Amino acid sequence: MRGANRTGRPFTGDYAGELLYSTLLEFGFASGVYDRRPDDGLTLVDCAIINAVRCVPPQNKPTPEEIATCRRYLTPAISVLPRLKIMVALGRIAHESALRALKRTLAKFPFAHGARHPLTAAGLSLFDSYHCSRYNTNTGVLTEAMFRQVFASVRAELDRMDVQAPVLG
């Protein structure tokens, strides 16, 4: 077992976690030190990580049925975040799962790395990023700079709002 399956904390113990947590630390969404262990002292700050798919399927490719099954956990997890202003979808599956959980039409909000999608009149927005997997970074689909730019945009928007808000992963 590797990553979150081994450690019990999302994105912990694999390359995706190294990139995600270093970025969260850089932009003030985490404090402490990330050391690939759930007891490393890292603390999320005004942010939450909620997986659209709760298990790691074979070849990291969940079936539509697995995605739909996990949505019954995603929808209530989002609904209990009263201060939620921004969600960050790490990949198309997270993007589509978040939209479906919020009962939005996928065609109105196409996935695009770096895109910002206003979702509600109350100011909830969804930002898109390619997933921070080793595969995406090794193939050049996603660079560290591209990933950090998404979180720089999120931080800038939150600073304009003068609020802190959770992030969806």
Describe the function of each predicted region:
Residues 1-163:
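A polyanion-binding, active-site-adjacent surface
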